[in-house]
Regions:
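Bacterial N-terminal signal peptides
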Residues: 8-18
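Boundary at the C-terminal end of the N-terminal hydrophobic targeting segment
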Residues: 19-25
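Short, polar/charged alpha-helical segment
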Residues: 29-39, 52-63, 73-94, 172
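Extracytoplasmic ligand-binding site segments that recognize negatively charged/polar headgroups
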Residues: 69-84, 96-112, 118-255
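A ligand-binding cleft/hinge motif common to bilobed small-molecule-binding domains
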Residues: 129-133, 257-276
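Periplasmic-binding protein-like
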Residues: 167-170, 229-234, 238-241, 245, ...
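Mature extracytoplasmic/periplasmic domains
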Residues: 286, 290-355
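Extracellular/periplasmic bilobal clamshell ligand-binding domains
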Residues: 334-383
Length: 383
Protein backbone atom coordinates (compact mmCIF):
# COMPACT_ATOMS: atom_id res chain seq x y z
CA UNK A 1 0.00 0.00 0.00
CA UNK A 2 2.79 2.37 0.97
CA UNK A 3 4.61 1.53 -2.26
CA UNK A 4 1.48 2.36 -4.26
CA UNK A 5 1.09 5.70 -2.47
CA UNK A 6 4.73 6.52 -3.18
CA UNK A 7 4.30 5.68 -6.86
CA UNK A 8 1.19 7.88 -7.11
CA UNK A 9 2.96 10.72 -5.32
CA UNK A 10 6.02 10.40 -7.56
CA UNK A 11 3.81 10.43 -10.64
CA UNK A 12 1.94 13.49 -9.44
CA UNK A 13 5.19 15.35 -8.82
CA UNK A 14 6.36 14.44 -12.33
CA UNK A 15 3.13 15.71 -13.91
CA UNK A 16 3.30 18.95 -11.94
CA UNK A 17 6.91 19.40 -13.00
CA UNK A 18 5.96 18.92 -16.65
CA UNK A 19 3.10 21.39 -16.35
CA UNK A 20 5.37 23.89 -14.66
CA UNK A 21 7.98 23.45 -17.36
CA UNK A 22 5.39 23.83 -20.11
CA UNK A 23 4.05 26.98 -18.48
CA UNK A 24 7.50 28.53 -18.29
CA UNK A 25 8.23 27.72 -21.91
CA UNK A 26 4.83 28.70 -23.26
CA UNK A 27 5.15 31.40 -25.89
CA UNK A 28 2.78 34.23 -26.76
CA UNK A 29 0.35 33.24 -29.50
CA UNK A 30 1.82 35.77 -31.94
CA UNK A 31 5.27 34.27 -31.43
CA UNK A 32 3.98 30.75 -32.02
CA UNK A 33 2.35 31.94 -35.25
CA UNK A 34 5.52 33.69 -36.44
CA UNK A 35 7.63 30.59 -35.81
CA UNK A 36 5.10 28.46 -37.70
CA UNK A 37 4.71 30.91 -40.59
CA UNK A 38 8.47 31.20 -41.05
CA UNK A 39 8.89 27.42 -40.67
CA UNK A 40 11.55 27.93 -38.02
CA UNK A 41 13.04 25.39 -35.66
CA UNK A 42 11.48 26.21 -32.25
CA UNK A 43 14.92 25.54 -30.74
CA UNK A 44 15.96 28.96 -32.06
CA UNK A 45 14.08 30.39 -29.10
CA UNK A 46 16.13 28.44 -26.56
CA UNK A 47 17.58 30.94 -24.14
CA UNK A 48 14.74 33.44 -24.51
CA UNK A 49 13.74 33.22 -20.85
CA UNK A 50 17.23 34.30 -19.78
CA UNK A 51 17.21 37.18 -22.28
CA UNK A 52 13.94 38.48 -20.82
CA UNK A 53 14.96 37.96 -17.18
CA UNK A 54 15.03 41.58 -16.07
CA UNK A 55 15.29 42.96 -12.51
CA UNK A 56 12.04 43.01 -10.55
CA UNK A 57 12.58 46.72 -9.97
CA UNK A 58 12.22 47.32 -13.72
CA UNK A 59 8.91 45.47 -13.81
CA UNK A 60 7.60 47.30 -10.75
CA UNK A 61 8.78 50.62 -12.16
CA UNK A 62 7.16 49.95 -15.54
CA UNK A 63 3.86 49.17 -13.81
CA UNK A 64 3.97 52.59 -12.18
CA UNK A 65 5.01 54.36 -15.39
CA UNK A 66 2.23 52.62 -17.35
CA UNK A 67 3.50 53.59 -20.82
CA UNK A 68 6.45 54.17 -23.13
CA UNK A 69 6.55 56.52 -26.14
CA UNK A 70 8.34 55.13 -29.20
CA UNK A 71 9.31 56.89 -32.42
CA UNK A 72 10.02 54.89 -35.58
CA UNK A 73 9.41 54.24 -39.27
CA UNK A 74 7.03 51.27 -39.14
CA UNK A 75 3.52 51.62 -40.41
CA UNK A 76 1.16 51.66 -37.40
CA UNK A 77 -0.36 48.34 -38.49
CA UNK A 78 3.09 46.76 -38.72
CA UNK A 79 4.08 48.06 -35.31
CA UNK A 80 0.89 46.68 -33.79
CA UNK A 81 1.49 43.27 -35.33
CA UNK A 82 5.19 43.20 -34.49
CA UNK A 83 4.72 44.07 -30.83
CA UNK A 84 1.82 41.71 -30.08
CA UNK A 85 4.04 39.37 -28.00
CA UNK A 86 5.40 42.31 -25.99
CA UNK A 87 1.89 43.43 -25.11
CA UNK A 88 1.00 39.87 -24.07
CA UNK A 89 4.09 39.62 -21.86
CA UNK A 90 3.81 43.13 -20.40
CA UNK A 91 0.09 44.03 -20.47
CA UNK A 92 0.71 46.79 -17.92
CA UNK A 93 2.80 48.81 -20.43
CA UNK A 94 0.93 50.88 -23.01
CA UNK A 95 2.97 51.28 -26.20
CA UNK A 96 2.43 54.78 -27.57
CA UNK A 97 3.85 54.63 -31.06
CA UNK A 98 4.53 57.71 -33.18
CA UNK A 99 5.56 57.28 -36.81
CA UNK A 100 7.99 60.03 -37.78
CA UNK A 101 10.19 61.10 -40.68
CA UNK A 102 13.94 61.59 -40.43
CA UNK A 103 13.75 65.09 -38.95
CA UNK A 104 11.06 64.07 -36.48
CA UNK A 105 13.10 61.13 -35.22
CA UNK A 106 16.28 63.15 -35.13
CA UNK A 107 16.73 66.87 -34.72
CA UNK A 108 13.20 67.80 -33.62
CA UNK A 109 13.47 65.53 -30.60
CA UNK A 110 16.92 66.90 -29.76
CA UNK A 111 15.86 70.55 -30.10
CA UNK A 112 12.88 69.90 -27.83
CA UNK A 113 15.17 68.19 -25.33
CA UNK A 114 17.42 71.25 -25.22
CA UNK A 115 14.31 73.31 -24.47
CA UNK A 116 13.46 71.04 -21.55
CA UNK A 117 10.78 69.01 -23.32
CA UNK A 118 10.93 65.21 -23.67
CA UNK A 119 8.90 64.12 -26.71
CA UNK A 120 9.71 60.40 -26.74
CA UNK A 121 11.36 57.73 -24.62
CA UNK A 122 12.69 55.40 -27.33
CA UNK A 123 13.91 56.31 -30.82
CA UNK A 124 14.80 54.07 -33.74
CA UNK A 125 16.75 54.63 -36.98
CA UNK A 126 18.47 57.88 -36.02
CA UNK A 127 21.78 57.34 -37.86
CA UNK A 128 21.98 60.82 -39.40
CA UNK A 129 21.50 62.47 -36.01
CA UNK A 130 23.18 60.05 -33.61
CA UNK A 131 26.43 62.04 -33.47
CA UNK A 132 24.52 65.11 -32.28
CA UNK A 133 22.84 63.09 -29.53
CA UNK A 134 26.23 61.75 -28.51
CA UNK A 135 27.73 65.25 -28.33
CA UNK A 136 24.78 66.40 -26.23
CA UNK A 137 25.12 63.32 -23.98
CA UNK A 138 21.40 62.82 -24.46
CA UNK A 139 21.28 59.02 -24.67
CA UNK A 140 21.17 56.52 -21.82
CA UNK A 141 23.74 53.75 -21.37
CA UNK A 142 22.15 50.41 -22.31
CA UNK A 143 24.89 48.11 -21.04
CA UNK A 144 22.61 46.93 -18.22
CA UNK A 145 20.13 45.31 -20.61
CA UNK A 146 20.25 41.49 -20.50
CA UNK A 147 20.02 41.55 -24.29
CA UNK A 148 22.96 43.89 -24.84
CA UNK A 149 25.39 41.01 -25.24
CA UNK A 150 23.10 39.35 -27.81
CA UNK A 151 24.47 41.77 -30.39
CA UNK A 152 27.90 41.80 -32.02
CA UNK A 153 30.17 44.60 -30.82
CA UNK A 154 30.21 45.82 -34.44
CA UNK A 155 26.51 46.60 -34.16
CA UNK A 156 26.45 48.58 -30.89
CA UNK A 157 27.84 51.93 -29.76
CA UNK A 158 31.20 51.71 -28.03
CA UNK A 159 29.76 53.69 -25.10
CA UNK A 160 26.57 51.61 -25.03
CA UNK A 161 24.22 54.47 -25.91
CA UNK A 162 22.56 52.67 -28.80
CA UNK A 163 22.05 49.13 -30.07
CA UNK A 164 21.22 48.00 -33.58
CA UNK A 165 17.87 46.26 -33.85
CA UNK A 166 18.13 45.29 -37.53
CA UNK A 167 20.41 45.34 -40.57
CA UNK A 168 19.54 46.92 -43.91
CA UNK A 169 21.20 46.12 -47.22
CA UNK A 170 21.57 48.95 -49.75
CA UNK A 171 21.94 47.20 -53.08
CA UNK A 172 20.07 47.14 -56.41
CA UNK A 173 16.54 46.16 -57.31
CA UNK A 174 16.12 45.11 -60.94
CA UNK A 175 13.34 44.14 -63.32
CA UNK A 176 13.59 40.41 -64.02
CA UNK A 177 11.78 40.79 -67.36
CA UNK A 178 14.49 43.16 -68.58
CA UNK A 179 17.69 41.97 -66.89
CA UNK A 180 19.11 38.46 -66.81
CA UNK A 181 21.10 37.26 -63.81
CA UNK A 182 24.23 36.80 -65.88
CA UNK A 183 24.17 40.52 -66.74
CA UNK A 184 24.33 41.62 -63.11
CA UNK A 185 27.59 43.28 -61.99
CA UNK A 186 29.86 41.32 -59.65
CA UNK A 187 31.53 44.45 -58.31
CA UNK A 188 30.70 48.15 -58.18
CA UNK A 189 33.35 48.85 -60.81
CA UNK A 190 31.62 46.32 -63.07
CA UNK A 191 28.42 48.34 -62.75
CA UNK A 192 29.83 51.62 -64.05
CA UNK A 193 31.80 49.87 -66.80
CA UNK A 194 28.80 48.03 -68.26
CA UNK A 195 26.99 50.09 -70.94
CA UNK A 196 23.86 47.97 -70.47
CA UNK A 197 23.13 50.09 -67.40
CA UNK A 198 23.59 53.35 -69.33
CA UNK A 199 21.21 55.64 -71.19
CA UNK A 200 18.72 55.94 -68.36
CA UNK A 201 18.40 52.22 -67.65
CA UNK A 202 19.45 52.85 -64.06
CA UNK A 203 17.38 54.97 -61.69
CA UNK A 204 19.18 56.76 -58.86
CA UNK A 205 17.61 58.28 -55.78
CA UNK A 206 19.27 61.11 -53.91
CA UNK A 207 20.50 58.98 -51.00
CA UNK A 208 24.26 58.56 -51.45
CA UNK A 209 24.96 58.31 -47.72
CA UNK A 210 22.90 55.11 -47.59
CA UNK A 211 25.24 53.15 -49.86
CA UNK A 212 27.99 55.18 -51.52
CA UNK A 213 29.45 56.74 -48.38
CA UNK A 214 30.38 53.36 -46.97
CA UNK A 215 32.13 52.48 -50.23
CA UNK A 216 34.09 55.74 -50.14
CA UNK A 217 35.13 54.82 -46.62
CA UNK A 218 36.12 51.31 -47.70
CA UNK A 219 38.08 52.10 -50.87
CA UNK A 220 39.27 55.65 -50.22
CA UNK A 221 38.51 59.04 -51.73
CA UNK A 222 40.48 58.49 -54.94
CA UNK A 223 38.38 55.46 -55.82
CA UNK A 224 35.23 57.20 -54.59
CA UNK A 225 35.70 60.23 -56.82
CA UNK A 226 36.46 58.10 -59.88
CA UNK A 227 33.47 55.83 -59.27
CA UNK A 228 31.06 58.72 -58.68
CA UNK A 229 32.15 60.48 -61.87
CA UNK A 230 31.84 57.25 -63.86
CA UNK A 231 28.40 56.60 -62.39
CA UNK A 232 27.03 59.88 -63.70
CA UNK A 233 29.13 60.42 -66.81
CA UNK A 234 29.25 56.90 -68.24
CA UNK A 235 25.80 55.67 -67.26
CA UNK A 236 23.77 58.91 -67.41
CA UNK A 237 21.26 57.52 -64.88
CA UNK A 238 17.78 58.84 -64.28
CA UNK A 239 17.95 61.14 -61.26
CA UNK A 240 14.71 60.44 -59.46
CA UNK A 241 12.93 62.54 -56.86
CA UNK A 242 11.16 59.52 -55.39
CA UNK A 243 12.24 57.82 -52.19
CA UNK A 244 13.78 54.36 -51.98
CA UNK A 245 10.49 52.47 -51.75
CA UNK A 246 8.79 54.37 -54.57
CA UNK A 247 11.81 53.94 -56.86
CA UNK A 248 11.72 50.19 -56.28
CA UNK A 249 8.07 50.28 -57.31
CA UNK A 250 9.07 52.00 -60.56
CA UNK A 251 11.43 49.10 -61.25
CA UNK A 252 8.49 46.73 -60.90
CA UNK A 253 6.52 48.93 -63.30
CA UNK A 254 9.33 48.83 -65.88
CA UNK A 255 10.15 52.55 -65.69
CA UNK A 256 13.84 51.61 -65.67
CA UNK A 257 15.80 48.36 -65.45
CA UNK A 258 17.23 48.86 -61.99
CA UNK A 259 17.21 51.24 -59.02
CA UNK A 260 19.98 52.18 -56.64
CA UNK A 261 19.90 52.01 -53.70
CA UNK A 262 17.01 49.73 -52.83
CA UNK A 263 16.17 48.23 -49.43
CA UNK A 264 15.97 44.45 -49.55
CA UNK A 265 12.73 44.35 -47.58
CA UNK A 266 10.96 46.62 -50.07
CA UNK A 267 12.05 44.46 -53.01
CA UNK A 268 10.92 41.36 -51.09
CA UNK A 269 7.44 42.81 -50.68
CA UNK A 270 7.12 43.30 -54.42
CA UNK A 271 8.30 39.74 -55.04
CA UNK A 272 5.66 38.36 -52.66
CA UNK A 273 3.05 40.22 -54.72
CA UNK A 274 4.28 38.56 -57.92
CA UNK A 275 6.01 41.62 -59.38
CA UNK A 276 8.95 41.06 -61.78
CA UNK A 277 11.53 42.26 -59.26
CA UNK A 278 14.88 40.78 -58.30
CA UNK A 279 17.58 41.96 -55.94
CA UNK A 280 21.32 42.04 -56.44
CA UNK A 281 24.34 43.08 -54.40
CA UNK A 282 27.65 43.87 -56.06
CA UNK A 283 30.59 43.21 -53.77
CA UNK A 284 31.19 44.49 -51.15
CA UNK A 285 27.60 44.52 -49.89
CA UNK A 286 26.68 47.92 -48.37
CA UNK A 287 24.99 47.61 -44.99
CA UNK A 288 23.48 50.24 -42.73
CA UNK A 289 22.45 49.74 -39.12
CA UNK A 290 19.13 50.75 -37.62
CA UNK A 291 19.71 51.90 -34.07
CA UNK A 292 17.41 51.87 -31.09
CA UNK A 293 18.17 54.23 -28.21
CA UNK A 294 16.63 55.65 -25.04
CA UNK A 295 16.76 59.29 -24.01
CA UNK A 296 18.68 59.70 -20.78
CA UNK A 297 15.91 61.99 -19.49
CA UNK A 298 13.15 59.53 -20.36
CA UNK A 299 10.34 59.72 -17.79
CA UNK A 300 9.51 56.07 -18.51
CA UNK A 301 12.96 54.53 -18.10
CA UNK A 302 11.84 51.13 -16.88
CA UNK A 303 9.21 50.62 -19.57
CA UNK A 304 11.72 51.84 -22.16
CA UNK A 305 14.28 49.28 -20.95
CA UNK A 306 11.70 46.50 -21.19
CA UNK A 307 10.85 47.47 -24.76
CA UNK A 308 14.42 47.81 -26.03
CA UNK A 309 15.47 44.59 -24.33
CA UNK A 310 12.55 42.77 -25.94
CA UNK A 311 13.36 44.20 -29.39
CA UNK A 312 16.85 42.70 -29.34
CA UNK A 313 15.73 39.38 -27.85
CA UNK A 314 15.25 36.30 -30.03
CA UNK A 315 11.50 36.85 -29.90
CA UNK A 316 11.64 40.52 -30.84
CA UNK A 317 14.06 39.83 -33.67
CA UNK A 318 11.93 37.03 -35.12
CA UNK A 319 8.77 39.15 -34.93
CA UNK A 320 10.48 42.00 -36.79
CA UNK A 321 11.48 39.56 -39.52
CA UNK A 322 8.03 37.99 -39.70
CA UNK A 323 6.31 41.38 -39.90
CA UNK A 324 8.49 43.35 -42.31
CA UNK A 325 11.40 41.10 -43.45
CA UNK A 326 13.81 42.92 -41.11
CA UNK A 327 17.19 41.18 -40.91
CA UNK A 328 18.14 40.22 -37.33
CA UNK A 329 21.29 41.38 -35.55
CA UNK A 330 21.05 38.76 -32.78
CA UNK A 331 24.16 36.57 -32.75
CA UNK A 332 22.08 33.37 -32.67
CA UNK A 333 19.98 34.40 -35.68
CA UNK A 334 22.70 35.10 -38.24
CA UNK A 335 21.19 32.52 -40.57
CA UNK A 336 20.32 32.53 -44.30
CA UNK A 337 16.62 31.93 -43.62
CA UNK A 338 16.37 35.42 -42.14
CA UNK A 339 18.00 37.15 -45.12
CA UNK A 340 15.81 38.08 -48.11
CA UNK A 341 17.60 37.24 -51.37
CA UNK A 342 20.21 35.27 -49.44
CA UNK A 343 21.68 33.96 -52.71
CA UNK A 344 23.02 37.42 -53.58
CA UNK A 345 24.11 38.39 -50.05
CA UNK A 346 25.29 35.42 -48.00
CA UNK A 347 28.94 34.56 -48.53
CA UNK A 348 29.92 37.93 -49.99
CA UNK A 349 32.21 40.46 -48.38
CA UNK A 350 30.16 43.06 -46.56
CA UNK A 351 30.74 46.68 -45.64
CA UNK A 352 28.90 48.02 -42.61
CA UNK A 353 28.86 51.80 -42.84
CA UNK A 354 30.66 53.45 -39.95
CA UNK A 355 28.19 56.15 -38.91
CA UNK A 356 31.14 58.35 -37.89
CA UNK A 357 31.51 58.90 -41.64
CA UNK A 358 28.30 60.94 -41.57
CA UNK A 359 30.13 63.82 -39.89
CA UNK A 360 33.47 63.31 -41.63
CA UNK A 361 35.41 65.21 -44.30
CA UNK A 362 34.88 62.17 -46.52
CA UNK A 363 31.13 62.70 -46.40
CA UNK A 364 31.56 66.40 -47.13
CA UNK A 365 33.69 65.68 -50.21
CA UNK A 366 31.37 62.93 -51.44
CA UNK A 367 28.28 65.09 -50.99
CA UNK A 368 29.81 68.07 -52.80
CA UNK A 369 30.77 65.91 -55.79
CA UNK A 370 27.44 64.08 -55.82
CA UNK A 371 25.45 67.32 -55.60
CA UNK A 372 27.44 68.88 -58.43
CA UNK A 373 26.17 66.11 -60.70
CA UNK A 374 22.71 65.80 -59.18
CA UNK A 375 21.83 69.46 -59.65
CA UNK A 376 23.50 69.92 -63.05
CA UNK A 377 21.51 69.61 -66.27
CA UNK A 378 23.95 67.16 -67.80
CA UNK A 379 26.61 66.80 -65.12
CA UNK A 380 29.78 68.84 -64.70
CA UNK A 381 32.72 68.53 -66.99
CA UNK A 382 35.76 66.60 -65.88
CA UNK A 383 38.37 68.81 -64.20
Amino acid sequence: MLRRILLIATGLVSVLALLSSAGAAELPKATQKAVADLKLDPALLNGLDAELDVPKAWLDGARQEKEVIISGTWEPREFQQMTAPFRERYPFVNLRYERAGTSGRGMQVLVALQEGRVLVDVMTSIADAVSYYTQAKALADLHDLPGFNNISKDYVAADGTWISHKLSFRCMAYNTDKVKKEALPKTWDDLVNDPRWGNGNLGLTNNPSAWLLGLWGEFGETWGEKFTRSLFEKLQPQRRKEGLSAATGLVAAGEFNGSLPSPEWVAKRYVTKGAPVGYHCPEPVPITLSQIAMLDKSPHRNAARLFINWMVSREGQILQNATSFDVPVHKALQLPEFVPFADTIVGKRKKVRDDALLVSDTNKKMTELWDSYWTAAAGPKKP
